[in-house]
Amino acid sequence: MDAALRHIVDQVQAARADKSVLDIHGGHTKAFYGGLPIGRPLDVRGLSGISSYEPSELVVTARGGTPLAELEAALAEKGQCLPFEPPRFTEPTNASVGAGSVGGTVGGMVAAGLAGPARVSVGGVRDYVLGAKLLNGRAELLAFGGTVMKNVAGYDVSRTLAGSMGVLGVICEVSLKVLPVPPATLTLRVEAEQGAAIRRVNEWGGQPLPLNASAWWDGMLVLRLSGALAAVRAAADKIGGEIIEVTTAAAFWAGLRDHRDEFFVGAAKAVETGACLWRLSVPPTTAPLKLSGEQLLEWGGAQRWICTTAPAALLREAAHAAGGHAVLFRGRDKGAGAFAPRKPVLARIQRELQLAFDPDGLFNPGRLLPE
């Protein structure tokens, strides 16, 4: 056990002894997400570095405090990537972090479970987690899964960490499956109203086309094709529309992924004056939702961002009626909880899981479920 891990173990043992709670953080770039952070800060940025990387095996293992940008740069050198496009939120949302923030970390990426524009075609964070080392509430270091897909021992436990918001323990190390960067990528822009855009993107999604990502906002549908050059060219001819220049397209998708584009910048400003940014997960073919406020659609219509002042109950009811759920992504008032209320049986399972890993409730209380 090195000094960085020993320091974290000591803090967990101290918190357990004095019955305090801990706020696990790396870059603190997702402090706005989920319930409000409370407790003594537990900084994991000392747990940094790529432990092992086997490009030929498409597997990388990194410590939890490793900057996400550092990991992705190492993968890019070998022509590989995290295909689910984890967002890089760069603004420190907690004043205690200050200018020394490293941006998002690998552990935070897994704990938040957020994925970018390609999620609908390649899967999410949990689909790429092969194994993990977790420090539980008893200050015990547990290992789950492995570094190859065929090693299934503990595999599901590792995947459970994705989206857990840190309530199960400190993610000390993660093994991830990576993939080669697609040989060809092309972005198209097509004018379409929301209903037509939903229909068309789902029609194309049901065909053997290399459709990697989509986004609709303000009457414009943007599509990304990725794969073999011949397949990308053939799909572009079939779909039509305006081809977006490569640099401009890359900036668009990065801005969408990192919430730096016009829609999300405007939403962040609106939140400061009392609006809320909601993320609704619904079946992709769901018709346009009749809700006030600006909307941006991703994932073929399966993910719908809405910036509105409408009551939380109205958003949750609309999502539920469509067969989905709503998450309060950004907003000042999270008294009712950021995430959709779970069915009693699922809430019970979650609490029992938390009790098994963190019996004293040390880690990130209230970030996932209201206390």
Could you describe each region identified by the protein language model?
Residues D23-I24, N212-W217, Q295-W299, L328:
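Short beta-strand
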Residues M1-L22, V44-G98, V110, L114-T147, ...:
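N-terminal glycine-rich flavin-associated loop
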Residues M1-T29, A319-P341:
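N-terminal accessory segments
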Residues G26, L223, I306:
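Residue-level signal for inorganic ion chemistry
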Residues N94-S214, M220-L221:
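FAD-binding subdomain of flavoenzyme oxidoreductases
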Residues G35-P37, P92-S96, I244-E371:
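Conserved glycine-rich FAD pyrophosphate-binding loop
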Residues R224, A228-A249:
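Terminal amphipathic helices with adjacent charged low-complexity linkers/tails
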Residues E193-A196, L225-V232, P283-T286, T308-A313:
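Helix N-cap motif at beta-to-alpha junctions
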